[in-house]
């Protein structure tokens, strides 16, 4: 088939969709038709004729012109679409859609006449930023809380504690109860999936089970039996259980309490590589301060990126939204698999359809963030020198030296992406204003109040001042 220049017209559509109108010459149509007819005549088996020797007139009569025309059109589409993409430098994101449908095109096809058809496809959107400088945002400053040191130490004491039997008293908060239970939904008395056990150790602390379960056990003695009424939370993972009332027949089989180790240097040696409790506290303080610092940085970055995304103008194509949505669902499935959940039985077609709808807003937000950063990098020429990438790549490789099955090509791409992101956030910090607000606290009159710090840096200048703000 000849590969003459196509007549191509393009028209931009909503959602970054492109309509491509193609005018195929009568010569190409005739060639495609003749080739389809010739190919079929060589393979057709008709009574009274040898294979490949069927006259074309007989073939048309027996097979029908429409079948040959359909083959001719299919071949034309295989040829002219890639030709149009190359000719017009179009990079499609998906397979094209034939506007009007194949049947309508077949009805209008005449091998002796030119053929005009329209194909639509999604293309990459063009992101534009209305502004990227002089923005003012608020971000919560994470403050180091000395109480966290004691909380971490208590957690460690709990982990190193010894469980000892409880005698002559009922269960109380902080105990560990060994219970058997069977649960049913109150509305139809049906058993709850996973709602029973012959023996389970339960920490009698808030948040360990659904609301009401632990509270129902507190006050029971060993061998006591009791029916406890509970209500499943509205955000419970098992969808059919959300907001439903349930009753659990519970029996306390055993009761234990924790004997905590003494808070001394011996405990510090057991809980860490430090020789004294004072050294342990200093180490925890340093880690908590660094954690607060990093979380503050993260809050600043998130606030700046959110403001940048608000300045983004983009027409996202449905193809990209669907791909990102599926990526989110696949990530959820991987997380479930890591928890030992049977993904195949859990992710039914019905659930996947629901997740496609519920995950769509997050997918759109993810794409907007990606394109906002991409647009800023392009506008401001933000790049990472190869030497810097190579240096960081070698550092990461060294850290992962004991890991197996590493895709180093993907690893290097991830390193580059991280470095680019760091440079984008550095640029945003230097060219915009971040007001850091402290967490809300109770003032003397009992009303919530906040204090804030404004830090602004542009280029190499840094300006910092402290001011009070009230939200």
Swiss-Prot record:
Its EC number is 5.2.1.8. Residues 436-446 have a biased composition (Polar residues). One of its GO terms (molecular function) is protein folding chaperone. Its main location: cytoplasm. NCBIfam families: tig. PANTHER family: TRIGGER FACTOR CHAPERONE AND PEPTIDYL-PROLYL CIS/TRANS ISOMERASE (PTHR30560), TRIGGER FACTOR-LIKE PROTEIN TIG, CHLOROPLASTIC (PTHR30560:SF3). This is Trigger factor.
């Amino acid at each position: 088939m000849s590969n003459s220049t196509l007549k191509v017209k393009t028209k931009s559509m909503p959602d970054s969709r492109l309509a491509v109108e193609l005018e195929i010459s009568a010569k190409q149509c005739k060639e495609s038709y003749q080739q389809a007819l010739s190919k079929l005549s060589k393979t057709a088996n008709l009574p009274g004729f040898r294979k490949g020797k069927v006259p074309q007139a007989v073939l048309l009569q027996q097979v029908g012109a429409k079948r040959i025309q359909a083959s001719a059109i299919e071949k034309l589409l295989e040829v002219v679409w890639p030709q149009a993409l190359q000719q017009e430098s179009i990079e499609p994101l998906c397979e094209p859609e034939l506007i009007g449908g194949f049947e309508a095109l077949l009805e209008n096809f005449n091998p002796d006449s030119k053929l005009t058809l329209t194909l639509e496809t999604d293309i990459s959107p063009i992101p534009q930023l209305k502004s990227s400088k002089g923005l003012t945002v608020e971000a919560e400053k994470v403050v180091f809380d000395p109480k966290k040191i004691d909380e971490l130490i208590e957690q460690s004491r709990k982990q190193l504690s010894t469980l000892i039997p409880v005698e002559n008293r009922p269960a109380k908060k902080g105990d560990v109860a060994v219970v058997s239970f069977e649960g049913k939904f109150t509305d139809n008395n049906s058993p709850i999936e996973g709602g029973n056990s012959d023996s389970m150790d339960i920490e009698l602390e808030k948040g360990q089970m659904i609301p009401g379960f632990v509270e129902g056990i507190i006050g029971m003695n060993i061998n006591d039996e009791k029916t406890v009424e509970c209500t499943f939370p509205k955000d419970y993972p098992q969808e059919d259980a959300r907001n439903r009332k349930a009753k659990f027949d519970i029996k306390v089989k055993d009761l234990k309490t924790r004997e905590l180790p003494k808070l001394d240097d011996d405990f510090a040696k057991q809980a860490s590589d430090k020789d004294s409790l004072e050294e342990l506290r200093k180490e925890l303080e340093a880690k908590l301060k660094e954690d607060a610092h990093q979380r503050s940085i993260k809050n600043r970055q998130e606030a700046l990126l959110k403001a940048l995304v608000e300045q983004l103008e983009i027409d996202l194509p449905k193809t990209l939204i669907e791909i990102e949505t599926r990526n989110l669902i696949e990530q959820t499935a991987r997380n479930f698999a890591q928890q030992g959940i049977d993904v195949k039985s859990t992710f039914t077609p019905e659930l996947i359809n629901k997740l496609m709808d519920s995950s769509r807003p997050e997918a759109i937000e993810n794409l907007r963030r990606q394109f906002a950063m991409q647009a800023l990098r392009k506008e401001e020429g933000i790049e990472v020198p190869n030497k810097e990438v190579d240096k960081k790549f070698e550092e990461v490789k060294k850290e992962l030296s004991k890991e197996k099955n590493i895709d180093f090509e993907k690893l290097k791409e991830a390193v580059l992406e991280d470095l680019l992101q760091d440079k984008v956030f550095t640029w945003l910090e230097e060219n915009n204003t971040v007001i850091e607000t402290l967490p809300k606290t109770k003032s003397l009159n009992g009303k919530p109040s906040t204090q804030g710090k404004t830090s602004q840096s542009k280029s190499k200048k840094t300006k910092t001042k402290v001011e009070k703000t009230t939200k």
